[in-house]
Amino acid sequence: MSKLVLILNCGSSSLKFAILDPATGEEKLSGLAEAFFLPEARIKWKLNGEKGNADLGAGAAHTEALNFIASNILNDELKNSIAAIGHRIVHGGEKYTQSVIVTDEVVKGIEDAAQFAPLHNPAHLIGIREAFKAFPHLKDKNVVVFDTAFHQTMPEEAFLYALPYSLYKEHGVRRYGAHGTSHYFVSREVAKYVGKPADQVNAIICHLGNGGSVSVVRNGQCIDTSMGLTPLEGLVMGTRCGDIDPAIVFYLYKTLGMSMDQIEETLVKKSGLLGLTEVTSDCRYAEDNYDDESKPETRRALNVYSYRLAKYIGAYMAVLGDDHLDAIAFTGGIGENSAHVRELALNHLKLFGIKIDNERNLATRFGKDGVITTDDSAFKAIVLPTNEELVIAQDTAKLCF
């Protein structure tokens, strides 16, 4: 068996894992351990096409999950084929512009960036430390891949806020973006699709899932993206508000008497599609009931969502200027599967000569890729499934094999 990479994506109460062959992209194992610290802590997986699940025990967390993977799921052949471990890291700050092997200095850098990703980075560090324990022979073969790295090519005019400059110089307050691993992968897929070298492609990439972001790529490099200091800025998302007037925070605090913790929970966990529908963060609910007059919240939510998305796409078309836009790409759970969202957003962009092909759009869902615009459309719109795990596996292999 060829050299394989174990990929870990640690959250505060869950752990996603996979084993990939970086040379072929073949997935040997995928799974999710969840409900950490609760009585119902559990794990489920798919190994060579066969599904399995198990209880981890009341209160189990990252340690128990990784030990279960190593001891109960992996057979000796697969375990011996794991040559390195790749970790997804949400925030690397300004320091990290590419993937690196884990060292004490790198761990310190992830800790320093945790102030901008307080829910994610501490959990990633737990994953790294537990991986050291579960796979001690691979301690010097752990690699971290940063979601912020691809966006580090943004120019100053794109990443700076119009705040006192000292906040940036002394405290790192600037725009960092997120979903960079996905944006990087899809930008390379766009290049293949249009027959151009990766370092010559110009694209607008819409990564739409429960979280969502748009990036604009010129000559293969990101020059702007919708998320900011944190993943709260930008698009309407499942539970996140995206762009708002910052003074709303003052109003909620001073006039409505909400605490800062309550405000944070409102903006991060109670807004977006959930806030607009007052029912659910699931985009499919709004889609399925869009024409139901008894549920006006669904039309309201989807219209706001797609309007905000169209504004970002249009703005980024302007940012490209004289550079020819090769394609607008849709990816992520919503981007790949919601023909309705794509249609609503692109219909706002008729001024640019974009023409959506309804038949192609409806046919391009559920893992299918393809062009969804007409042959005479001024610009192509393409649906391209993302593969962040493959990027992590390949980056890890480059550094370790």
Curated annotation (Swiss-Prot):
Cofactor binding description: Mg(2+). Can also accept Mn(2+).
PROSITE patterns: ACETATE_KINASE_1, ACETATE_KINASE_2
Reaction catalyzed: acetate + ATP = acetyl phosphate + ADP
Ligand binding (substrate): R88
Top-level taxon in the UniProt lineage: Bacteria
Pathway: Metabolic intermediate biosynthesis; acetyl-CoA biosynthesis; acetyl-CoA from acetate: step 1/2
Stated name of the protein: Acetate kinase
Organism of this sequence: Haemophilus influenzae (strain ATCC 51907 / DSM 11121 / KW20 / Rd)
Record gene name: ackA
